[in-house]
Amino acid sequence: MPMRYLNAMAALLMMFFTLLILSFTGILEFPSASTSMEHSIDPEPKLSDSTSDPFSDVLVAYKKWDFEVGCARFRENHKDAILGNVSSGSLQEFGCGKLKMKHVKVLVKGWTWIPDNLENLYSCRCGMTCLWTKSSVLADSPDALLFETTTPPLQRRVGDPLRVYMELEAGRKRSGREDIFISYHAKDDVQTTYAGSLFHNNRNYHISPHKNNDVLVYWSSSRCLPHRDRLAKSLLDLIPHHSFGKCLNNVGGLDSALSMYPECVAEHNAEAKWYDHLHCAMSHYKFVLAIENTAVESYVTEKLFYALDSGSVPIYFGASNVQDFVPPHSVIDGSKFGSMQELAAYVKRLGDDPVAYSEYHAWRRCGLMGNYGKTRAVSLDTLPCRLCEEISRRGGKNAGV
């Protein structure tokens, strides 16, 4: 065998034994399944297995989270949420290319629960303007008529205003007479969510920096549906809570919130209604129980969004695709737990873990909205412009029948 081959073999053997020695001494470490798991970033925060650390000051809790986790890691954990993928589709985004009208006039017909302060002349995207009004004087020649509690006309001829029908309740059903249908589902002509702020402009938005330690959960309901009360009771019996409203009330009456939290009195009205101080009262609790009247896909109402606005963590029962509508890691989906006992145990442990609890608020502090950005973008706040755009795409009164 030539000498050069012997030299090569000797060199290889020396390298092999050197690497073997280094690996045994720990100087050189090869990747392994256990090593990569130890150094990977957990997608969800782990609840501490150590002694609980009850807290009431959320600002102190946030600082602990900043030190132990931080926004960079949170963004890495939830980088897919930045794309805002919606499994159930829509949360609409349309371009300007198919618009046929620069100005659209919408006349709202009959009684509607949409507040009057929505009436306005709007400057919309794509150089459009939109008049939304209940006045037939201001909209003397409307391009569309909007109906909610009344049924649109049976027939429409070319040259007549388009017929728009809105139904935002869980059992959403077309009238069969509309040209454009507004509701909460991705399949609807104009999708609209409950995530806006339009309906509570005059509320007290004071957010308490301190959370109750002895009472974890806030719940308020005055429409006492049997199935919802049973569901609420099955969880609340296991967790310290305050129940406001008529259903399962345990705070001594309907108007107890202001005596418990006097800072929640609205400045403009010392005798405010319960909903005027709703967010402020909620903000004193680490968790808010939010149960929809009906569990239907995409039917996500103000019950959930109020809790998010108040700086609390919602415990949610309702739409199976709720994650399509909310910020990343912001909601506890009660349906994902095997039992109420399991859910209650999780909530109690979370309430005593300042770092894991703060993770549920990281989306707001780190500016990671995910799908929630789209949810807010298609709320009732933006409905006038979005409806006018749809009317423009169809050509308004010149649309075919």
Swiss-Prot record:
SUPFAM superfamilies: UDP-Glycosyltransferase/glycogen phosphorylase (SSF53756). Its EC number is 2.4.1.-. One of its GO terms (biological process) is protein glycosylation. The keyword Ribonucleoprotein does not apply. The chain crosses the membrane at residues 5-27. Present in root, stem, flower buds and green siliques. It holds the Pfam family Glyco_transf_10. Belongs to the glycosyltransferase 10 family. This is Alpha-(1,4)-fucosyltransferase. The gene is FUT13.
